[in-house]
Amino acid sequence: MEEKYGGDVLAGPGGGGGLGPVDVPSARLTKYIVLLCFTKFLKAVGLFESYDLLKAVHIVQFIFILKLGTAFFMVLFQKPFSSGKTITKHQWIKIFKHAVAGCIISLLWFFGLTLCGPLRTLLLFEHSDIVVISLLSVLFTSSGGGPAKTRGAAFFIIAVICLLLFDNDDLMAKMAEHPEGHHDSALTHMLYTAIAFLGVADHKGGVLLLVLALCCKVGFHTASRKLSVDVGGAKRLQALSHLVSVLLLCPWVIVLSVTTESKVESWFSLIMPFATVIFFVMILDFYVDSICSVKMEVSKCARYGSFPIFISALLFGNFWTHPITDQLRAMNKAAHQESTEHVLSGGVVVSAIFFILSANILSSPSKRGQKGTLIGYSPEGTPLYNFMGDAFQHSSQSIPRFIKESLKQILEESDSRQIFYFLCLNLLFTFVELFYGVLTNSLGLISDGFHMLFDCSALVMGLFAALMSRWKATRIFSYGYGRIEILSGFINGLFLIVIAFFVFMESVARLIDPPELDTHMLTPVSVGGLIVNLIGICAFSHAHSHAHGASQGSCHSSDHSHSHHMHGHSDHGHGHSHGSAGGGMNANMRGVFLHVLADTLGSIGVIVSTVLIEQFGWFIADPLCSLFIAILIFLSVVPLIKDACQVLLLRLPPEYEKELHIALEKIQKIEGLISYRDPHFWRHSASIVAGTIHIQVTSDVLEQRIVQQVTGILKDAGVNNLTIQVEKEAYFQHMSGLSTGFHDVLAMTKQMESMKYCKDGTYIM
């Protein structure tokens, strides 16, 4: 029986079956993983050599030689004409289309290589199909695979943005005009013109071009699967496709050879470099990927293949010596390039890290709903499981749908709606300022635009805090997300303190040596900023005044209470009161208001200092106004920081101290109540004041009556989320059985005798 049913009984062709993939022991996979990593290392070597070759060889000639060498090898070993079924005319047409598409993708790939260099090309283009498909699934479908896949997609997008915005690739930036060698054919001239039309630098256009080529490659591979099955396998299809590509490119190469001057003095000297590129990039990588895809899962193959090629790219980007370039330079016919071209930068390193993280996450199989905890059984005997992470899984959705739902929630509530409208107005003014600054080459406008962009980040944080505060409570966050507004206000306050500190230090430095200022564009910019900020002041002023006045108002809530009788040695009751208060400190709105107020003061200070400088030449007015503004910002934000810290540290709300003192005195006088202990009261959010208390009652009293009276007294004092524990004599007897004396327990609970009161009603334990 063991021999009959042992082995891969569940495995189908290729190691998989209808019942799911069978895990291969890791020891058997080690050799394939090592082979895959070594192959990716060699492919990185081939791409770096390809970049050097493309400096001397026309891109069409380069692709033709690669296709020719690959076709020769694959036709020789695969024998596509003598093995397998006969190719029909309809299939030959499809193979022709396949070859055309392959040539176009190769053209985009290698032209992107000439623009970005091999390091950035490897980071952008060498992603597995499963990674790109997972990325597109997250972005454009509602079943993207959960929060992990969404996080991986975000990492991928951040990596591309790092290459676009934070990569100081100086080679192309230094070239005001392209060398004539780049325009030696209509094809390259057309591609450069298309990139110039986008209005971006060449290496940034190369990044966009490689992203486009990557998407085309994935679509090309997906569309080729059915054709590979029809013609007898992927290897046979590749052999025929490369052969057709050679025939397609041959006339073009002949025309180029006749009409253009070759930069290569001796083609014989390039045989070994081309052979290396053909074998490492085209042949070895294809065959090893095919073998590893069969022996391992596709996701594992993608995950184990991405890390070594990205690390190899970083290493070669720093240590590659361009041997072929030196050889061509010795011939005195290749264009001289600096050895520092396409070097490593901080943006590239950060981008590589994010690419590695995204490839690892996006290539991992989705594990939604695979692990759960047994929590009990149904009345019918069915086991019930609680699946970990379900609090987060249900909210996973596509990004467009998430944005749509978020906008809907933002516009439903007054606070978030006001922040959103002011954020849009602020962003509009910011981009107008940046656009006009670039148009007029005004550094002052550009710097002020980026300053306002920084202020917008505070508005975005306040907006998301207002949105998250309305999220429903989950199993993990059982109290909900109401306190996120307090945290947002605290962080905004810290930002303002940092801003005030740096403005203060810069103002002191300028007081000693006042610089001369160009006030040409300061007045219109400051007036425009003042108008925008005054609109924000009017919109958010209610939050500031409400935070100081409305918290004294009474609380209105609907409550419910219940008692729970414990069995055995104790008899407990628990009462709960839940409701929503009528007002409180909204630290989030106060933080947003103070940010707008700081910008308003800044605009006023700039206007005043500009007038004094233009009319009287008082350059010292600028640092004096800035110093005054920094002090005002600091003084206005200190109360916000203080209040937010008190809430985060669970301090008794100061506005309720006297009411709670009176309420505890009333509780002590309730008939049948002996004493109370452990009274704890704190503000949870702007609308919730929570509390817990233990009360000791006589054995003959009705617990629910006591709970109702205590709940009513504390609700009138402002506590709208209350938990009461009722303790009877049986509880103390139970504690006595646990080696604690009855009189000791009773003395422990009578805290009223040891409680000290201040004259203002504040009590101290």
Swiss-Prot record:
The entry assigns this protein to a family as follows:
Belongs to the cation diffusion facilitator (CDF) transporter (TC 2.A.4) family. SLC30A subfamily.
What topology does the record note for this protein and the membrane?
A: Multi-pass membrane protein
Cellular component GO terms, alphabetical = apical plasma membrane; cytoplasmic vesicle; endoplasmic reticulum membrane; ER to Golgi transport vesicle membrane; Golgi apparatus; Golgi cis cisterna membrane; Golgi membrane; membrane
Please list the residues that bind Zn(2+). H451, D455, H595, D599
Note down the stretches annotated as region His-rich loop: 542-578
Q: Which biological process terms from the Gene Ontology are attached to this UniProt entry?
A: cobalt ion transport; GPI anchor biosynthetic process; insulin processing; intracellular zinc ion homeostasis; response to zinc ion; zinc ion import across plasma membrane; zinc ion import into Golgi lumen; zinc ion import into organelle
In Gene Ontology terms, what is one molecular function of this protein? Answer: zinc efflux transmembrane transporter activity
Provide this UniProt record's keywords sorted from A to Z. Acetylation, Antiport, Cell membrane, Cytoplasmic vesicle, Endoplasmic reticulum, Golgi apparatus, Ion transport, Membrane, Metal-binding, Transmembrane, Transmembrane helix, Transport, Zinc, Zinc transport
Q: What does this protein do?
A: Together with SLC30A6 forms a functional proton-coupled zinc ion antiporter mediating zinc entry into the lumen of organelles along the secretory pathway. By contributing to zinc ion homeostasis within the early secretory pathway, regulates the activation and folding of enzymes like alkaline phosphatases and enzymes involved in phosphatidylinositol glycan anchor biosynthesis. Through the transport of zinc into secretory granules of pancreatic beta-cells, plays an important role in the storage and secretion of insulin.
Pfam families reported in the protein's UniProt record: Cation_efflux (PF01545)
Q: Where expressed (tissue)? A: Ubiquitously expressed. Highly expressed in pancreas, liver and kidney. Expressed abundantly in insulin-containing beta cells, undetectable in other endocrine cell types including glucagon-secreting alpha cells and most acinar cells (at protein level).
Q: Which residues lie on this side of the membrane: Lumenal?
A: 54-56, 120, 174-193, 260-267, 325-342, 440-448, 505-520, 614-617
Q: Which residues form a coiled coil?
A: none
Question: Effect of altering H451A?
Answer: Loss of zinc transporter activity
Record carries keyword Amino-acid biosynthesis:
no
Residue ranges spanning the membrane: these are: 33-53, 57-77, 99-119, 121-141, 153-173, 194-214, 239-259, 268-288, 304-324, 343-363, 419-439, 449-469, 484-504, 521-541, 593-613, 618-638
Which NCBIfam families does UniProt cross-reference here? CDF
According to its UniProt entry, this protein's organism is Homo sapiens
Summarize the record's induction comment.
Answer: Expression is regulated by zinc. Up-regulated by endoplasmic reticulum stress.
Q: What is the effect of changing D599A?
A: Loss of zinc transporter activity. No effect on localization to the trans-Golgi network
Modification comment: Could homodimerize through the formation of dityrosine bonds upon oxidative stress.
Protein name, entry field: Proton-coupled zinc antiporter SLC30A5
